[in-house]
Amino acid sequence: MIGMGKFKISDALNLRAGKNFRIDDVDPTATPGFDGSKSDLADRFAHYDEELYELQERLFANGRAHEESAPSVLVVLQGMDTSGKGGAIRYVFSVFDPQGTKTVGFGKPTEEELEHDFLWRIRKHDPVPGQVVAFDRSHYEDVLIQRVHLSLIHI
């Protein structure tokens, strides 16, 4: 089960939406799989804090020692406004050493960003070796918004 050990590929595959999934049917206030308060949740996952801190510290040190071959981590949160992306990032990243992390929010593209391909503004924030980076939103939204917006302009 997720949150009860190592996260496996099978866990990720279980998170996929089925063929008949409709976003209209989702209750945005629901917390499926968890019945409890915020403090219950914090208590349930508190034992991971030290492990996460140590793993991030080793990752960062490895990045400093073996810059080119060291791994990095990119966390991408995509969701509607007020869906809790920023809160999730703040909560998870609160256990990390800030010098090995970076959080990037993507809003409306600037004029300079619009002059380049849609991944240009994303690539400049890719994690360097040993770094953990969180993206608050992603390039998927850029592609969707720009295409839908441009198609509406041309109607």
Per-segment meaning from a language model:
Residues I153-I155:
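Conserved small/polar residues in nucleotide/adenosyl-binding loops
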Residues I2-E51:
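Charged, amphipathic alpha-helical linker segments immediately N-terminal to NTP-binding catalytic cores
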Residues K85, E112-E115, E141-R147:
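Switch/connector loops and helix/strand junctions flanking conserved nucleotide-binding motifs
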Residues G63-P71:
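Phosphate-binding P-loop
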Residues L77-V92:
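Glycine-rich phosphate-binding P-loop
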Residues G130-V132:
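Loop/turn-to-beta-strand initiation segments
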Residues Q99-P109:
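Short beta-strand-centered segment that lines the nucleotide-binding/catalytic pocket of NTP-utilizing
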Residues S94-P98, E112, K124-V128:
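Conserved catalytic network of the ASCE P-loop NTPase/AAA+ motor domain
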